């Protein structure tokens, strides 16, 4: 086999892709690359299907872009980081946050990261930018969206931190519920 063919396959991955209303397919796609100095590339080790993925399939998410790799519930190992990423490094096991956010805009500074004004902000992974139902995922704002997993926590245990647990915690926080509320 020639080197060109081998190298081209090394840059290809499998990705579960939203094709059109009612249709997903497992496709070969190029592996993601660092596009911004704040990005990280994560090799996905475990992911789950969220109800939001099913909403995309059934046409309930008009902002979902056909051709996008779905999925925003995943854990993995950092493969590569951009030059401005300081909180994670290659080899770290991480959870990936459901929300992508800059941390700098008005909404992020107020804690409403779902309304981040960055084009890749809010629920972007698996909806408007390629998500984690793939072998690899490019994570914008890696220092905001990746959290290291302690060695005592399995991938399966950590999987619920990025969306399932975080969504309930965040909803309670922005609702300004206090300990005295019933």
Enumerate the language-model features and the residues they cover:
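Cytochrome P450 core scaffold surrounding the K-helix E-X-X-R motif
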Residues: 52-58
